[in-house]
Amino acid sequence: MTVTVYLEVHDPALPAEVTALPWERWFRTWMAMVEPTQGKVYELTLRLTTDAAIQALNQQYRDRDTPTDVLAFATRDGALPLPLGEPEYLGDIIISGDTARRQAAESGHTLSIEIAWLACHGLLHLLGWDHPDEAELARMLTQQAQCLEAVGLTPPAALQ
C-alpha cells in the first residue's frame, strides 16, 4: 500500500517539529489498520491552517460561523473501481493550528500529538466513519487511540 500526503502549511506559527512529522508513514500505518488492502495507492491532502481560514470553510460548507479543529472533505464515492495501481484520491483534511494549540495546552499534551489525533480523525471521516451518536463516537475515538499507539504516540487521555 502506498499513501501520498500532500502537505500544505498555511499557518506560519506551526513549528517545524509538526510540519516535519512522518505523515506518509503514519497515514500508511493507519490505512493498513482501518482498511487493509494490498497494492492500493492512495492520495490525500493535509492542510494545516489558521482559525480564520477554517472558520471560513466551516461557514461555507457547514453553515457554522465558528472555527473548528478539523474538517474533512471526502472525495470517495466508490462508484467506479480504479485500475490496480491507480491512485485513489481520498480527499482533504484541514486542521486549524490555532485550535490545535489551544486544545493541546488545555489537555496537557504536545501539539504534535494533538495534530496527529486530529489528522487521524479526519482520515476516518474520509473513509466514511462518522459519529452521529455517543456509541459511534466512542468507536471512532477507540480507533484513533489505537492508530496513534501504532505509530508510537500516546493518545490524548482526555479524548479517549
Swiss-Prot record:
<keyword id="KW-0963">Cytoplasm</keyword>
<comment type="function">
    <text>Single strand-specific metallo-endoribonuclease involved in late-stage 70S ribosome quality control and in maturation of the 3' terminus of the 16S rRNA.</text>
</comment>
<dbReference type="GO" id="GO:0006364">
    <property type="term" value="P:rRNA processing"/>
</dbReference>
<keyword id="KW-0690">Ribosome biogenesis</keyword>
<dbReference type="GO" id="GO:0004222">
    <property type="term" value="F:metalloendopeptidase activity"/>
</dbReference>
<feature type="binding site">
    <location>
        <position position="121"/>
    </location>
    <ligand>
        <name>Zn(2+)</name>
    </ligand>
</feature>
<keyword id="KW-0540">Nuclease</keyword>
<feature type="binding site">
    <location>
        <position position="125"/>
    </location>
    <ligand>
        <name>Zn(2+)</name>
    </ligand>
</feature>
<keyword id="KW-0255">Endonuclease</keyword>
<dbReference type="Pfam" id="PF02130">
    <property type="entry name" value="YbeY"/>
</dbReference>
<comment type="similarity">
    <text>Belongs to the endoribonuclease YbeY family.</text>
</comment>
<dbReference type="InterPro" id="IPR023091">
    <property type="entry name" value="MetalPrtase_cat_dom_sf_prd"/>
</dbReference>
<dbReference type="GO" id="GO:0004521">
    <property type="term" value="F:RNA endonuclease activity"/>
</dbReference>
<keyword id="KW-0698">rRNA processing</keyword>
<dbReference type="InterPro" id="IPR002036">
    <property type="entry name" value="YbeY"/>
</dbReference>
<dbReference type="GO" id="GO:0005737">
    <property type="term" value="C:cytoplasm"/>
</dbReference>
<keyword id="KW-0378">Hydrolase</keyword>
<feature type="binding site">
    <location>
        <position position="131"/>
    </location>
    <ligand>
        <name>Zn(2+)</name>
    </ligand>
</feature>
<dbReference type="GO" id="GO:0008270">
    <property type="term" value="F:zinc ion binding"/>
</dbReference>
<keyword id="KW-0862">Zinc</keyword>
<protein>
    <recommendedName>
        <fullName>Endoribonuclease YbeY</fullName>
        <ecNumber>3.1.-.-</ecNumber>
    </recommendedName>
</protein>
<keyword id="KW-0479">Metal-binding</keyword>
<dbReference type="InterPro" id="IPR020549">
    <property type="entry name" value="YbeY_CS"/>
</dbReference>
